[in-house]
Amino acid sequence: MNEYELLDSGHGRKLERFGKVTLDRPCAQAVWNPSHPAVWKQADAFFTRKQGLEWRGRERLPDSWIAEVNGVRMKLSTTDFGHLGVFPETRAMWDWIRESVTQASHARREPLNFLNLFAYSGGATLAAAQGGAHCCHVDASKGMVQWARENAALNNLAEHPIRWIVDDVNKFLTREIKRGRRYDAVLLDPPSFGRGKGGELYKIEHALLETLELVEKVMSDQPAFVYLTSHTPGFTPIVLKNLIQQLLGQGQLDCGEMLLTGSDSTFAVPSGTWARWEVSQKSNRF
């Protein structure tokens, strides 16, 4: 089931429905004209960055609400930065991960070990868990990890084998290497800029290569896939593909844009990039 829909976009804005709530938020890349001007009147609230960060109509919204996005029930809430606790451009990736994990687990006759880095509110973690994977969810924000745990409970996955880790990603990976822990599949969505649990500075242009080198070292000898996403300007699909290919070598490589999508009468909105490495029968990288 899916309760998300992109209703329209244009004039630097996007209009989206999340379950029972419709929101009008900034979207710098939507430089075209709106396709359906009348539908914008449906917005329950409006977020602007023109004079600081401000929600208009926020008082009309519930403090939080539940919406199912591509089979994952998510708790949503308007944050002071205009976020909600889900990035719907990743929902196609959730579907791919759920299906790939299911197929790989059946083929191996054992659960895949799935690692989600910079894991936010856990949509991908829960999609992997729905596919039967044993998961490890890592984020530097204690609040976001707690939010993800609440989402797990909403999906009847509170007792599923998921390790919830609040930590700096690179420090966590270094410790996992020393402990000898290995993972069959890894997803990472590094921020452009962030701080770790202990205040460690993370700038993607300086830190990502180190992160990927550490990821390579925690991969099992029977890897399934590595999935890399980014919302950083300049980190195009080819940039991400080159990074993965250089480190992981032979395998099936794909890349593209993450998109917000609605009906056929609305424009798809580019909202980030992705690259993916999958093991192939000819690959002997590991």
Model segments located where?
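S-adenosyl-L-methionine
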Residues: S141-L187
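S-adenosylmethionine
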Residues: V169-G249
